[in-house]
């Protein structure tokens, strides 16, 4: 079980919160998280790269020049891979890069990644609820009050991010906003600091704390 300080929108301490998740064994934790990240990155690939083989290249099957008497190497087709504009040998074809991973492994990897970043988590009560209009400066100042530098890669996790928060954050290159039900290993490990809403932390505990 890990304990976190809960802060309000002004950065002042507003209580305590706990997170108790079962993590993978130390011997297999790194490998488990690594496979989860590889799987997530592989699923981002479109797999639409395609080249033409000699049977698909435009052009007839005519012989470019006669078999003998030219002094050149013999050629049987203008579509051969040996000629410019010919087919491609062993080129890419559309395929799926998806990698399989058991559900229990995926959940264990996420829990392990989350607990590994527990020292970098800042729990905030009512994050952004006081915003009356979309203002990037308000988010930047709030992160500053939480002790997070402007050039830090930040992951903000909220249960249901409001439209005001979404529009205020989207102009910040170093800040990424996701909902608690879209939590993933890559984002958890990629960010330098994590800002988690108090209600989002409760949701995470409810969803992942039973295993």
Curated annotation (Swiss-Prot):
Keyword rRNA-binding among UniProt keywords: yes
UniProt keyword terms in alphabetical order: Ribonucleoprotein, Ribosomal protein, RNA-binding, rRNA-binding
Listed GO MF terms: rRNA binding; structural constituent of ribosome
Entry keyword Transmembrane: no
Basic residues composition-biased segments: 60-71
Location of region: Disordered: 42-87
GO cellular component: ribonucleoprotein complex; ribosome
Pfam families associated with the record: Ribosomal_L4
Gene Ontology terms describing biological process: translation
Gene3D superfamilies the UniProt entry points to: 3.40.1370.10
InterPro entries: Ribosomal_uL4, Ribosomal_uL4-like, Ribosomal_uL4_dom_sf
PANTHER family, sorted: 50S RIBOSOMAL PROTEIN L4 (PTHR10746), LARGE RIBOSOMAL SUBUNIT PROTEIN UL4C (PTHR10746:SF17)
Subunit structure: Part of the 50S ribosomal subunit.
NCBIfam families: rplD_bact
Entry function: One of the primary rRNA binding proteins, this protein initially binds near the 5'-end of the 23S rRNA. It is important during the early stages of 50S assembly. It makes multiple contacts with different domains of the 23S rRNA in the assembled 50S subunit and ribosome.
UniProt record similarity statement: Belongs to the universal ribosomal protein uL4 family.
Record-given protein name: Large ribosomal subunit protein uL4
Gene giving rise to this polypeptide: rplD
């Amino acid at each position: 079980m890990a304990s976190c300080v809960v802060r309000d929108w002004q950065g002042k301490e507003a209580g305590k919160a706990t997170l108790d998740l079962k993590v993978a064994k130390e011997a297999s934790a790194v490998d488990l998280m690594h496979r989860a990240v590889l799987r997530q990155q592989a699923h981002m690939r479109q797999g639409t790269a395609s080249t033409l083989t000699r049977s698909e290249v435009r052009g007839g099957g005519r012989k470019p020049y006669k078999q003998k008497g030219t002094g050149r190497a013999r050629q049987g087709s203008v579509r051969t891979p040996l000629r410019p504009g010919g087919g491609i040998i062993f080129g890419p074809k559309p395929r799926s890069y998806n990698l399989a991973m058991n559900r229990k492994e995926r959940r264990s990897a996420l829990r392990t990644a989350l607990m590994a970043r527990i020292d970098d988590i800042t729990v905030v009560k009512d994050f952004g609820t006081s915003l009356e209009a979309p203002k990037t400066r308000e988010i930047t100042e709030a992160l500053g009050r939480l002790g997070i530098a402007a050039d830090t890669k930040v992951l903000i996790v909220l249960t249901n991010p409001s439209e005001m928060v979404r529009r205020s954050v989207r102009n910040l290159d170093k800040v990424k906003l996701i909902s608690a039900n879209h939590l993933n290993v890559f984002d958890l490990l990629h960010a330098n600091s994590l800002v988690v809403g108090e209600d989002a932390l409760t949701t995470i505990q409810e969803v992942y704390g039973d295993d």
